[in-house]
Structures are given as C-alpha cells and as structure tokens.
C-alpha cells in the first residue's frame, strides 16, 4: 500500500493558537487499528493544573478520516521525601483536598445530565476541593470533561475488595 499523508495539529482548546502542525508520510496503513509514534516538542505549551486548567486539542487527519482529542499536559507522581510519601502534580507538591462522589443522580440514578455533572464539579471547587473520588462507580465522561475544564482531579476507586490481594498477584 502506498504512503498516505497524515496531518497532526495541536491547538489551544478554546482558542485559535496552533502550537504544532505538521504533515507526516505514513506507510503500511491497514483497515482496522494502526499505531504510529511521533515525538514532538511543544515549548509554548502550558501545564494543566487545578488552578490553571490549560487544555489543548490534538487533531489527526488521514484522508477523509479525522479524530480530535482534548487533553492537558500534566503528570502525577508519588515521591518519597525522607520516608514520607507525598503527591506531586507537574513536579510540585499538592495536598489533596477531596470528598467522595457516590454518583447518585436524581434524574435517572445511573448517569448525570450535563447540568448535574457541571454542578458537581463547580460545587467541589467552591468548597475548596481539588479532587473528588468516584466511589463504587465508574466515572462518567461528562463529569471528567468538566473536571478537566474547571481544574478538578478525580480518583476512581478500584473496588474489588471482595477478593484477597493474593488474587491479583502474579506469583
């Protein structure tokens, strides 16, 4: 199969500023899933944080196929500081102020409307929280989208406490 052109673009989510735009030649594309790796440098990109939730759109176009994904540049890690485990967001220590979200939604009991999802995130921010926990539930995409937009971290509790830890070990 001959090479095709792929256009890769990174731009501000709610702006017009384009941080990166380049056309690549991709070969051996087949029907179904294809994986390609590209390393790009974006020195003008701003990090996402709970105080400044900068978001970007990554767009990929090959022929008539287009895909766009919103994202933020961030990394979360746990560091050992003199025997004390501490959380870091983008290399800076963060103290997590959180509460449980039971995800009981009055409209239907299963999934939140966009209005309720946004209200939950806004309420958490007004209370001074920087994180919520999805408790005994899987996070809904509209809740996570608003959390990204408004600067709120989410933790999804893994559940499964009915099984002993040995059930998950490879040994």
Name the predicted role of every residue range.
Residues 138-140, 160-163:
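Solvent-exposed loop/turn segments at secondary-structure junctions
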Residues 97, 161-171:
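Active-site-adjacent "subsite" loops/lids of carbohydrate-active enzymes
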Residues 1-146, 150-154:
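Secreted/periplasmic carbohydrate-active enzymes, especially glycoside hydrolases
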């Amino acid at each position: 199969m001959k090479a095709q052109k792929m256009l890769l673009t990174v731009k501000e989510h709610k702006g017009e500023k384009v941080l990166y735009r380049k056309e690549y030649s991709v070969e051996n594309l087949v029907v179904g899933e294809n994986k390609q790796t590209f390393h790009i440098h974006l020195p003008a990109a701003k990090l996402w944080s709970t105080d400044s939730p900068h978001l970007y759109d990554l767009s990929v176009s090959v022929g008539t196929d287009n895909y766009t994904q919103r994202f933020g540049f961030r990394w979360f890690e746990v560091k050992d500081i003199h025997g004390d485990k501490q959380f870091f967001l983008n290399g800076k220590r963060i103290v997590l102020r959180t509460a449980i979200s039971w995800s009981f939604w009055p409209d239907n009991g299963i999934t939140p409307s966009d209005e309720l999802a946004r209200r939950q995130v806004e309420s958490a921010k007004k209370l001074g929280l920087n994180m919520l926990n999805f408790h005994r539930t899987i996070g809904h995409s509209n809740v996570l989208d608003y959390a990204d937009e408004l600067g709120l971290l989410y933790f999804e509790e893994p559940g499964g406490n009915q099984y002993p830890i040995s059930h998950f070990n490879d040994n």
